[in-house]
């Protein structure tokens, strides 16, 4: 389904750099015949991993064609691969899933039995991720000129990591990237200059990191051409941080000295080269702007040259759009790429479109993609009636239809169900474009957390035991994610049944214990976001209707 390419027509511009032209031509090359690229990718994956323990089970005998692969290798979920992943995690270095050594695990925001899923990664995966990153600014430059004349204020953070019993790092995908040489030793690029120094981004103390990044952004406010964070919720947390700390930030700027709250040696040393003298004029400006009760349009007041916000506002993040519009004065919101811990998938070729119109073009060189037609009768029905012969190739999906994404990666995931539900919106050349609809089976989500019905049910059951001895029990509950507060939080409504009125009405002390019990019962992603990252606020637990018998 080839169409006239807007990228191709824009590439003839005299202002387009040679580097950008090369990147845009690569996108055109990959999307003209995605089926051919996909065939090559699958062949490479199966050839290099033919001697792995996993693939040997299916008697491929060196055959790498798609028909044989799809007829012999089953579609799987994380639970199916858990034994193999556990062996690798424990230190088994034999070629179980991949012929290349597994160098680390990327922790997924999805969970299994309450703990983060571990996605195997090989060293060259960093190169693939870097390749996708390298395509983002060439596309953006087609729509927003002059980004090389200033800087980006991006609030970027590393999250806590651990090591498996076998000694492999286990950490979120962006933490892995920020700590890699690809990021730390990235060559100078005028289109990718950040106000935040690496020392602040790499600080594991999120409070010190945020303070230093915000201070740098304020000191360079006239140079800032774009603001961003990974998620919309992250940018709103930065605004909330400014609301709570602008007096201290203004004092640092006024005196030319760094707050004592910054004690990380690397940040202190770096900031001594940035905060070099008092700036009374800037400090007075900040006090004047931030002391106002109305913060509508605060972003463009402080950073007047900002052209757009670079944040994810699709899926669960769409709930933050109105608040971002309020604080930004209606700035465009750019969603630039689609990625996960399993693999990086694609890019938005129209990054300045409305959030409701965001579609991602899958780059066929990143992995081998299949699509399971989504059953609208419900996820349970779709699970029960899985027909592996119904999976559709990347080039054969149909506009308007919804699919669940299934991937095969170089690192050793074969026909793995990612759990993302996508809708086909069109094509770029012959490559399909998808709108992210939702994450499968997710009931509650504030940021990167994903809580399903079973997890919430277990948490409610555990908490309800605290007052069962008094003869009170939960007969009904409902929930929602409250995102009008920053940070957002879960709200759970309970309908209680007690022996009498005094039993049905719970004290604040008991409610507090119930909230704590529920939070401790939720998955590890929620607990980390709640305690370490502070990206989720305290649980709101409310007794709605009390009944007694």
Swiss-Prot record:
Family matches, as InterPro entries: GH3, GH3_C, GH3_M
Pfam family, one: GH3_C
Expressed in which tissues: Expressed in flowers, pollen, cotyledons, stipules, true leaves, hypocotyls, and all parts of the roots except for the primary root tips.
Enzyme class of the recorded protein, top EC level: ligase
A Gene Ontology biological process term: response to auxin
Induction of expression: By auxin. Down-regulated by blue and far red lights.
Entry superkingdom: Eukaryota
GO molecular function, one term: indole-3-acetic acid amido synthetase activity
Signal peptide as annotated in the record: none
Keywords: Ligase
The enzyme's E.C. designation: 6.3.2.-
Role of this protein: Catalyzes the synthesis of indole-3-acetic acid (IAA)-amino acid conjugates, providing a mechanism for the plant to cope with the presence of excess auxin. Strongly reactive with Glu, Gln, Trp, Asp, Ala, Leu, Phe, Gly, Tyr, Met, Ile and Val. Little or no product formation with His, Ser, Thr, Arg, Lys, or Cys. Also active on pyruvic and butyric acid analogs of IAA, PAA and the synthetic auxin naphthaleneacetic acid (NAA). The two chlorinated synthetic auxin herbicides 2,4-D and 3,6-dichloro-o-anisic acid (dicamba) cannot be used as substrates.
Similarity remark: Belongs to the IAA-amido conjugating enzyme family.
Name of the protein this chain belongs to: Indole-3-acetic acid-amido synthetase GH3.2
Lineage: Eukaryota, Viridiplantae, Streptophyta, Embryophyta, Tracheophyta
């Amino acid at each position: 389904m080839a169409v006239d390419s807007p990228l191709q027509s824009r590439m003839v511009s005299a202002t387009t750099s040679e580097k950008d032209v090369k990147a845009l031509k690569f996108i055109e090359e990959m999307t003209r015949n995605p089926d051919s690229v996909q065939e090559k990718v699958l062949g490479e994956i199966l050839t290099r991993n033919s001697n792995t323990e996993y693939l040997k089970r299916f008697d491929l005998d060196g055959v790498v064609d798609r028909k044989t692969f799809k007829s012999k290798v089953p579609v799987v979920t994380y639970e199916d691969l858990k034994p193999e992943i556990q062996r690798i995690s424990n230190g088994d270095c034999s070629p179980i899933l991949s012929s290349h050594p597994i160098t680390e695990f990327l922790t997924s925001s999805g969970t299994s039995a309450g703990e983060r899923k571990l996605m195997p990664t090989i060293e060259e995966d960093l190169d693939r991720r870097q390749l996708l990153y390298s395509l983002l600014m060439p596309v953006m430059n087609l729509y927003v000129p002059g980004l090389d004349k200033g800087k980006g204020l991006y609030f970027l953070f590393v999250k806590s990591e651990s090591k498996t019993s076998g000694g492999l790092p286990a950490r979120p995908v962006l933490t892995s990237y920020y700590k890699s040489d690809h990021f730390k030793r990235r060559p100078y690029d005028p289109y990718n200059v950040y106000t935040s120094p690496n020392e602040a981004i790499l600080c594991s103390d999120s409070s010190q990191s945020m303070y230093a990044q915000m201070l740098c952004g304020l000191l360079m406010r006239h140079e800032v051409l774009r603001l961003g964070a990974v998620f919309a919720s992250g940018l709103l947390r930065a605004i909330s941080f400014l609301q709570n700390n602008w007096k201290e930030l203004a004092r640092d700027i006024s005196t030319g000295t760094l707050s004592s709250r910054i004690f990380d040696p690397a940040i202190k040393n770096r900031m001594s080269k940035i905060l070099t003298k008092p700036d009374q004029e800037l400090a007075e400006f900040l006090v004047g702007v931030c002391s106002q009760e109305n913060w509508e349009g605060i972003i463009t007041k402080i950073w007047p040259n900002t052209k757009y916000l670079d944040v994810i506002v699709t899926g669960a993040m769409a709930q933050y759009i109105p608040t971002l519009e309020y604080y930004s004065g209606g700035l465009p919101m750019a969603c630039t790429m689609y990625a996960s811990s399993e693999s990086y998938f694609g890019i938005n070729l129209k990054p300045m479109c409305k959030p409701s119109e965001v579609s991602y073009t899958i780059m066929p060189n990143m992995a081998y993609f299949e699509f399971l037609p989504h059953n609208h009768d419900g996820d349970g029905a779709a699970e029960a009636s899985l027909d592996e012969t119904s999976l559709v190739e990347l080039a054969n999906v149909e506009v308007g239809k919804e699919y669940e994404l299934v991937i095969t990666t170089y690192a050793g995931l074969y026909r793995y169900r990612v759990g993302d539900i996508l809708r086909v919106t069109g094509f770029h050349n012959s490559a399909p474009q998808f709108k992210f609809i939702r994450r499968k089976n997710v009931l509650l989500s504030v940021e990167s957390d994903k809580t399903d019905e079973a997890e919430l049910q277990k948490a409610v059951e555990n908490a309800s035991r605290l007052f069962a001895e008094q003869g009170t029990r939960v007969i009904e509950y409902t929930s929602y994610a409250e995102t009008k507060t920053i940070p957002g939080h879960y709200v759970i409504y309970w309908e209680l049944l007690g022996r009498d009125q005094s039993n049905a009405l719970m004290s604040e002390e008991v409610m507090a214990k119930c909230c704590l019990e529920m939070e401790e019962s939720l998955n590890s992603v929620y607990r980390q976001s709640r305690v370490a990252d502070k990206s989720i606020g305290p649980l709101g637990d409310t007794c709605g209707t009390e009944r007694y018998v």
